[in-house]
Amino acid sequence: MHQQQLTDEHKLKLWAYARSSSSRPSVLIQQMQGLLADAERNHWTVVGTSQDMSTGRTLARMGLREAQSAVRQGLANGILIEDVGRLSHEYSTALRVLEFLQDHSAVLICTQTDARYELYIKGLSQPLQQRAMSKGGIVPWRER
């Protein structure tokens, strides 16, 4: 399986990304602390962090751009988040980020939810699986 090949053949280098639309900085701090603690418990390597205190409706977010830049440059091959909603609650916005990860053979790891199930119930897993099959790539999520 392509997904297994990434995790077996290449050491995961994760970028921890937190996002909240709350105006309280403590929400982002708590979210990031949770991500880093989970990474430590699972012996995952975190190569960088970024965060956004904004809505997830747009891709024009500095923290998300930093995470994508790290993936694009090969500094990271995965993004660590609490749940898919941290990318976006909107289908098309989340799909664009996941397609970006797929195009760069990178994965998404969710610490608070089962990414595969969450993507399935949001209707995102099937188009990504079909895209992976047609392009010979990977599905952009990893089981915890």
Language-model-derived ranges and their functions:
Residues 1-144:
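Short, structured surface patches at the beginning of a domain
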